[in-house]
């Protein structure tokens, strides 16, 4: 689900009435025997926030918590975590040309890194489980960052564990082996955890290869009076948004929701 209550409802997420609401009033009026309908409240005041830039970043790989060590893969729940993201880390054997990484299964969205460089993603929605990885030296660091995107709460898929649910295998030179010897980092989605991160001046949101740098980005802006507004993240990728410590919602470049609705207090 998107972070929104606007499922084509008669009243929008921001509290404004829609044409559907007007049609409903017209229909109901036919059966009210001339009784007067209640007055529609005025729209909630909105404000415009001038464009602002993010000035600080806490890179993910420089701000990891203490890991847990495990020989084999386990789910997020088995590491006492119910939501957020989780990072699985191990080392790779020497890969002369290329190899195929198979993750069974990543719930729900996995980003793959080798020695800190983004290689690709595995999206559960699309049934993606395999990724080709390039040649690398023995001991190269493999990171699999898995985000839990919400739980299925009906039907046969209700048993919906998060993280990597079974195993990770590498097909290298015609031989398939299960990767073992993992360090596991719990990355819970709690604002208290973000406050302790080490931020540094933001020079670019992309690395030398043009890939977005995973991490926590921070900006400061001021409003003169309280009001409702929408924060536009159309040029960003995938992540979570907090304002003054309050979780506003998820953003994702694929849509359908390019903006996040929020109420701002003067500060």
PLM feature segments, named:
Residues 262-267:
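Conserved small/polar residues in nucleotide/adenosyl-binding loops
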Residues 90, 144, 219-221, 231, ...:
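Preference for bulky hydrophobic residues occupying beta-strand positions
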Residues 127-131, 219, 258-260:
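Short strand-edge motifs at loop-to-beta-strand transitions and within beta-strands
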Residues 88, 108, 217, 237, ...:
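Residues that flank catalytic or metal-binding motifs in active/ligand-binding sites
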Residues 120-127, 249-257:
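A short acidic/small-residue loop/turn micro-motif
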Residues 84-85, 206-230:
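Functionally critical, mid-to-C-terminal surface segments that flank or help form catalytic/ligand
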Residues 98-113, 221-244, 251-252:
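Aromatic-lined ligand-binding clefts that engage carbohydrates, nucleic acids, or primary amines
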Residues 1-204, 223:
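Carbohydrate-binding surfaces of carbohydrate-active enzymes
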């Amino acid at each position: 689900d998107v972070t929104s209550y606007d499922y084509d409802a008669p009243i929008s997420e921001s509290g404004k009435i829609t044409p559907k609401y007007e049609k409903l009033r017209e229909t109901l009026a036919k059966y009210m025997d001339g009784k007067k309908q209640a007055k529609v409240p005025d729209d909630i005041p909105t404000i415009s926030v001038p464009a602002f830039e993010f000035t600080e970043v806490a890179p993910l790989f420089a701000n990891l918590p203490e890991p847990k060590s495990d020989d084999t893969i386990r789910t997020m729940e088995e590491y006492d975590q119910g939501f957020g993201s989780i990072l699985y880390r191990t080392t790779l054997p020497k890969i002369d040309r290329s190899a195929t990484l198979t993750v069974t299964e990543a719930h729900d969205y996995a980003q793959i890194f080798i020695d800190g460089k983004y290689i690709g993603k595995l999206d559960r929605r699309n049934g993606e489980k395999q990724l080709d990885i390039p040649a690398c030296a023995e001991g190269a660091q493999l990171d699999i960052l898995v985000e839990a995107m919400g739980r299925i709460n009906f039907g046969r898929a209700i048993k919906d564990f998060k993280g990597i649910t079974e195993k990770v295998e590498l097909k290298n030179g015609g031989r398939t082996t299960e990767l073992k010897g993992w360090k596991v980092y719990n990355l819970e989605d709690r604002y208290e955890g973000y406050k302790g991160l080490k931020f540094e001046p933001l020079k670019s949101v992309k690395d030398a290869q043009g890939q977005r740098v995973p991490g926590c980005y921070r900006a400061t802006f001021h409003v003169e009076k309280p009001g409702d507004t929408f924060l536009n993240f159309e040029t960003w990728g995938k992540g979570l948004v907090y304002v003054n410590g309050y979780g506003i919602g998820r953003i994702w470049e694929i849509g359908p929701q390019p903006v996040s609705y929020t109420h701002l207090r003067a500060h």
